[in-house]
Amino acid sequence: AILAGIVLDTKSFTLRTGDRTFDAAAYLRRAGADTVAVKKLMQNGMEQTVAKYKILQRAQLYRSMAVAVPETPQNRIVAAQAADELLNVAGVDASMVMYPTEDGGVFVSARSIGDVNVQLIMEKLGGGGNRAAAAAQINGLTLKQAVEKLYAAIDEYIDS
């Protein structure tokens, strides 16, 4: 379970990873941690996998950022995983998945690698988080209006 937590927290040893992270993982492996069990623990069901790839099909590039806007409510975990997956696309510095919620609001999950600080972009939408992972809940706007506000926030972030 500890090795699974390290893999999850570091996004498979790609973020917030230093010598001590690898030392801890090596220690756990020597102590019998099962890497196959960790992989199986991280697997999604078929329904979640299909939902994630449907979100990915909606992605478009905007100023070196991948923005996916499915028009139906989404599972927040699946949407966050889709945002993570979009970072695997060459040339993408940040990603956002924006979708309507069941209660009439709009939610956006944002991820980044490198220099883009998605926290600053999400703060412009009333949300927050940290440099690499942030989110916002937007009320009182349609999905189309929220997308326009997101693009304006991206423009303001890049142009400032």
Describe the role of every protein-language-model region.
Residues 3, 8-124, 129-160:
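Hydrophobic helix-and-loop "lid/oligomerization" segment in the mid-to-C-terminal part
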